[in-house]
């Protein structure tokens, strides 16, 4: 969207805060139904990020595929589970939670240090070459492919990681 600078910045900060709150809700809420709704909120915030980035097709695909299909499927599956164990045996902190928090914090700081140490000059140069190349492209699908592999690579990969973690969590819950 072509918004004035302060409004665009406010919306980015607001959506980022919404992503953080929704992500914490997915991880910290003891009821899996509320966690699934929080995941839906996170996915809607990501699609709004795409709208702010003028990538309306990817935002629509995000809403239709991830929010409309996958999140509804997760909620549908969670509703069929027996939730009596979640309401009675909830402990605030266990040893496994501490180990998981330590591993996740270590991964977060290593990713931040990797991002800060990366030379982004080559990435910007590749993006500029793709913008020159983009003028010669005819079809919209080629333009979407280039944008997904250059401009929106990080959000695209983050969504795939979120889905992988959700599938691993669903498998571990189903095995118990």
Curated annotation (Swiss-Prot):
EC code? 7.1.1.-
An example GO CC term for this entry is: chloroplast thylakoid membrane
Main location as per UniProt: plastid
Cellular localisation = Plastid, Chloroplast thylakoid membrane
Keywords linked to the UniProt accession:
Chloroplast, Membrane, NAD, NADP, Plastid, Plastoquinone, Quinone, Thylakoid, Translocase, Transmembrane, Transmembrane helix, Transport
Task: Answer yes or no on keyword Plastid.
Answer: yes
UniProt topology in membrane: Multi-pass membrane protein
Swiss-Prot/TrEMBL catalytic activity:
a plastoquinone + NADH + (n+1) H(+)(in) = a plastoquinol + NAD(+) + n H(+)(out); a plastoquinone + NADPH + (n+1) H(+)(in) = a plastoquinol + NADP(+) + n H(+)(out)
Q: Which of the seven top EC classes does this enzyme belong to?
A: translocase
According to the record, the segments passing through the membrane are 10-30, 32-52, 61-81, 92-112, 152-172
Q: Which InterPro entries match?
A: NAD(P)H-Q_Oxidoreduct_6, NADH_UbQ/plastoQ_OxRdtase_su6, Nuo/plastoQ_OxRdtase_6_NuoJ
Please list the GO terms describing molecular function. Answer: NADH dehydrogenase (ubiquinone) activity; quinone binding
The subunit field of the Swiss-Prot or TrEMBL record says: NDH is composed of at least 16 different subunits, 5 of which are encoded in the nucleus.
Quote the function comment for this protein: NDH shuttles electrons from NAD(P)H:plastoquinone, via FMN and iron-sulfur (Fe-S) centers, to quinones in the photosynthetic chain and possibly in a chloroplast respiratory chain. The immediate electron acceptor for the enzyme in this species is believed to be plastoquinone. Couples the redox reaction to proton translocation, and thus conserves the redox energy in a proton gradient.
Q: Which family does it belong to?
A: Belongs to the complex I subunit 6 family.
Output this protein's name. NAD(P)H-quinone oxidoreductase subunit 6, chloroplastic
- Taxonomic lineage per UniProt? Eukaryota, Viridiplantae, Streptophyta, Embryophyta, Tracheophyta
Gene name as annotated: ndhG
């Amino acid at each position: 969207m072509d918004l004035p600078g302060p409004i665009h910045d406010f919306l980015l900060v607001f959506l980022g805060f919404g992503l953080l709150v929704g992500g914490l809700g997915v991880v910290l809420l003891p009821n899996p139904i509320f966690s699934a709704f929080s995941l839906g909120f996170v996915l809607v915030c990501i699609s709004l990020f795409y709208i702010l980035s003028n990538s309306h097709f990817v935002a629509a695909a995000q809403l239709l595929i991830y929010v409309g299909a996958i999140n509804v499927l997760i909620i549908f599956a969670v509703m069929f589970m027996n939730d009596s164990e979640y309401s009675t045996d909830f402990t605030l902190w266990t040893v496994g939670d501490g180990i998981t928090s330590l591993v996740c914090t270590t991964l977060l700081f290593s990713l931040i240090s990797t991002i800060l140490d990366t030379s982004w000059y080559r990435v910007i140069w590749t993006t500029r070459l793709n913008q020159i190349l983009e003028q010669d492209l005819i079809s919209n699908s080629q333009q979407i492919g280039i944008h997904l592999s250059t401009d929106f690579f990080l959000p695209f990969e983050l969504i795939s990681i979120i889905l992988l973690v959700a599938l691993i969590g669903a498998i571990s819950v189903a095995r118990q």
